[in-house]
Amino acid sequence: MFNLQKRINGNNEDGRYLETRIAVRDKLLAQELQQLETALRDQKQKLWHLEVPSTSCLHELELTVTPQEGIYRGGKFRFKITVPPEYNNVPPVVKCLTKVWHPNINEDGSICLSILRQNSLDQYGWRPTRNLTDVVHGLVSLFNDLMDFNDALNIQAAQMWSQNRESFNHRVREYISRYC
């Protein structure tokens, strides 16, 4: 009998669902990595670099974002992107590996970014039509488009940004010199 929860967890009668999902994910990733390679070459400014540490694990990627302007200029922010078997039905899992003072990135590296949410309250959440290029652009924009922190993950950073911009900028520069 068909059991939805078992199916979601990757279990079914013949045990092949998870294998099929991994095959689909890897095929999508191969296509998307080619698109990202082209996008990387076409950059006017080198704002990001993507690496696949192991060719046998296409689903584990490392992204380095290097802002060229703004308060995060000069920093090198590393992210680990893990693409689950259920991709593209669920978003990749992204963790910031570089300690950074940012309203949307907390001290343990968790990230608040609509595109990374399965169930987002706005229209920018994850959908199967999204891809890794969208994720990369979203992560790059975290360091360029400081706009709205009503949904901040690092509350202290958001409050400092809105109440004392000079102190916020100083703390950002301090973190960049210490951790980047």
Swiss-Prot record:
<dbReference type="Pfam" id="PF00179">
    <property type="entry name" value="UQ_con"/>
</dbReference>
<keyword id="KW-0963">Cytoplasm</keyword>
<feature type="active site" description="Glycyl thioester intermediate">
    <location>
        <position position="112"/>
    </location>
</feature>
<keyword id="KW-0217">Developmental protein</keyword>
<dbReference type="GO" id="GO:0061654">
    <property type="term" value="F:NEDD8 conjugating enzyme activity"/>
</dbReference>
<dbReference type="GO" id="GO:0045116">
    <property type="term" value="P:protein neddylation"/>
</dbReference>
<keyword id="KW-0067">ATP-binding</keyword>
<feature type="domain" description="UBC core">
    <location>
        <begin position="24"/>
        <end position="180"/>
    </location>
</feature>
<keyword id="KW-0833">Ubl conjugation pathway</keyword>
<keyword id="KW-0547">Nucleotide-binding</keyword>
<dbReference type="GO" id="GO:0019788">
    <property type="term" value="F:NEDD8 transferase activity"/>
</dbReference>
<comment type="pathway">
    <text>Protein modification; protein neddylation.</text>
</comment>
<dbReference type="InterPro" id="IPR016135">
    <property type="entry name" value="UBQ-conjugating_enzyme/RWD"/>
</dbReference>
<comment type="function">
    <text>Accepts the ubiquitin-like protein NEDD8 from the uba-3-ula-1 E1 complex and catalyzes its covalent attachment to other proteins. Plays a role in male tail tip morphogenesis.</text>
</comment>
<dbReference type="InterPro" id="IPR023313">
    <property type="entry name" value="UBQ-conjugating_AS"/>
</dbReference>
<dbReference type="GO" id="GO:0005737">
    <property type="term" value="C:cytoplasm"/>
</dbReference>
<comment type="similarity">
    <text>Belongs to the ubiquitin-conjugating enzyme family. UBC12 subfamily.</text>
</comment>
<dbReference type="GO" id="GO:0043518">
    <property type="term" value="P:negative regulation of DNA damage response, signal transduction by p53 class mediator"/>
</dbReference>
<dbReference type="GO" id="GO:0005524">
    <property type="term" value="F:ATP binding"/>
</dbReference>
<dbReference type="GO" id="GO:0110039">
    <property type="term" value="P:positive regulation of nematode male tail tip morphogenesis"/>
</dbReference>
<dbReference type="InterPro" id="IPR000608">
    <property type="entry name" value="UBQ-conjugat_E2_core"/>
</dbReference>
<dbReference type="InterPro" id="IPR050113">
    <property type="entry name" value="Ub_conjugating_enzyme"/>
</dbReference>
<keyword id="KW-0808">Transferase</keyword>
<protein>
    <recommendedName>
        <fullName>NEDD8-conjugating enzyme ubc-12</fullName>
        <ecNumber>2.3.2.34</ecNumber>
    </recommendedName>
</protein>
